[in-house]
Design a protein with these regions (language model features):
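Helix-turn-helix
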Residues: 13, 21-55, 59
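Amphipathic alpha-helical interface segments
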Residues: 17, 21, 38, 164-171
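Hydrophobic alpha-helical connector segments
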Residues: 59, 74-104, 148-161
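Amphipathic alpha-helical segments used for helix-helix packing
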Residues: 102-125, 171-175
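C-terminal peripheral helix-coil segments that are non-catalytic and often amphipathic
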Residues: 100, 104, 132-144, 148, ...
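Short acidic/histidine-centered micro-motifs embedded in hydrophobic/aromatic stretches
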Residues: 63, 111-115, 129, 160, ...
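Generic hydrophobic, amphipathic alpha-helix propensity
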Residues: 10-19, 35, 60-72, 138
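Amphipathic alpha-helical packing segments from all-alpha helical-bundle domains
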Residues: 66-73, 89, 110, 120-146, ...
């Protein structure tokens, strides 16, 4: 008889399964029974470790937000450090880092894009709790460092990165990462009134070989 699964391992398996299913099918299109089957556990075990589907969804979104926040805060710190000497290069580096994150963790843009389609409408607080503070922190930093841009202009630039990157990462053209990266840089720099940086070093393309969209990856540490 197989030994019982340790509580942490079981919880991580449930979260990994739920993350993939919510990202691919949305909250409304996923059942607790599907999550239990995907995690290889029974429904009683799922309920014991994470509660109901609503509790599980909130935890999945919290983990996605924490991963995204860590990357955005790190990229903002680098932007603040470098923008004085090379504002265009700092902006390009920020967009590169966010694109890399979305390619490495495709479940994050997938989860948010599901919400854009009115999925999980009963969780209306998640945008204000998670997305809005990050958007405002990037917007306010742009206005502070690049004073030629109004708050409205800076916010639209942030949304440009968000919408285009999320859409690209869910598309069938993920073999075009270098082409899209260059396009995104040009687009955002033009929005912010900055020239393209000269001699921009080549970027490592962590996902260039992913020619077709894949099932969303699960958060690091819970697979």
């Amino acid at each position: 008889m197989p030994a019982p699964q340790p509580p942490i391992e079981s919880r991580d398996r449930i979260l990994a399964a739920a993350t993939a299913l919510f990202a691919e099918h949305g909250y409304d299109g996923t059942t607790t029974r599907q999550i239990a089957a995907a995690s290889g556990l029974n429904m009683a075990t799922v309920n014991y470790h994470v509660g109901g589907k609503a509790d599980l969804y909130r935890e999945v979104m919290r983990l996605a937000h924490e991963a995204e926040r860590a990357v955005v805060e790190g990229a903002l710190a680098a932007f603040l450090r470098d923008a004085g000497a090379d504002p265009a290069g700092a902006v390009a580096a920020f967009t590169d880092r966010y694109l890399d994150f979305c390619l490495e963790q495709p479940h994050v843009p997938a989860l948010w894009m599901r919400r854009w389609l009115a999925d999980a409408a009963e969780f209306a607080d998640l945008e204000d709790r998670y997305a809005r503070p990050l958007i405002e922190s990037v917007r306010d930093t742009i206005v502070e460092i690049l004073p030629g841009n109004s708050a409205d202009e800076a916010e639209l630039a942030v949304y440009t990165v968000l919408w285009t990157t999320h859409g690209f990462c869910r598309s069938a053209i993920r073999d075009q990462v270098p082409r899209f990266r260059a396009h995104l840089r040009r687009l955002v720099l033009k929005q912010l009134g900055l020239p393209e940086p000269s001699g921009q070093p080549g970027q490592t393309e962590p996902s260039e070989q992913r020619a077709q969209p894949q099932q969303p990856d699960v958060p690091a540490g819970i697979a």
